[in-house]
């Protein structure tokens, strides 16, 4: 990445587009504190996360950022319900079965809650990962091709639900996508080329 300066407002839905290898995922990783820039800062809620220790950054991510990446990282030793509520348990928050069910119904996985996630299709696993990311209502939701394993109709349906949830809870959503239909749903599109915003 080179000479990138972007500002994203609270409750804004931003889509990042560009050809493969242009730096979209790297930018997303920087915004989520998964990588450090060689120069510059990353401010979230007036906190420069590049200055946080690894422990502080991990805690900050847990409380403020939800991730939906292409690698779902579901835990096979837990059922679907337990995977969804895991971040809340790590944060020592109360678990609302009603809220889990509401999200699961929206994502059409309500009948899978007691199953092992490894027995589900790729699309169903992706919906479990989405449910897990949004269950704690993070300040920022980051997604890398978050509907990549879903068919076109389901992709649009899931994105409409995510957009509704973000508006309801004043969340900011930043996603990387190659799908122009998904990008068209965003408030703003950032185009990248050769490591730069164009």
Feature map (PLM): residue ranges:
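H-loop (His-switch) and adjacent beta-strand-loop-beta switch element
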Residues: 189-198
């Amino acid at each position: 990445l080179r000479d990138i300066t972007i500002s994203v407002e609270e409750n804004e839905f931003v889509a990042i587009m560009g050809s493969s290898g242009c730096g979209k995922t790297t930018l997303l990783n920087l915004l989520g504190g998964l990588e450090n820039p060689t120069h510059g800062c990353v401010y979230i809620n007036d906190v420069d996360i590049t200055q946080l220790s690894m422990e502080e950054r991990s805690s900050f991510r847990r409380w403020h950022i939800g991730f939906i990446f292409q690698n779902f990282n579901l835990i096979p030793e837990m059922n679907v319900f337990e995977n969804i509520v895991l971040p809340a348990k790590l944060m020592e928050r109360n678990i609302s079965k009603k809220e889990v069910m509401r999200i699961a119904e929206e994502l059409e996985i309500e009948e899978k809650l007691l199953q092992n996630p490894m027995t589900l299709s790729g699309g169903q696993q992706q919906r479990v990962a989405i449910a897990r990311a949004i269950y704690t209502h993070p300040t920022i939701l980051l997604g890398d091709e978050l509907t990549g394993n879903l068919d076109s109709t389901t992709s649009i349906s899931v994105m409409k639900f995510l957009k509704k949830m973000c508006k309801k809870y004043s969340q900011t959503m930043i996603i990387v996508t190659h799908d122009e239909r998904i990008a068209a749903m965003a408030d703003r599109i950032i185009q990248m080329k050769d490591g730069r915003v164009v």
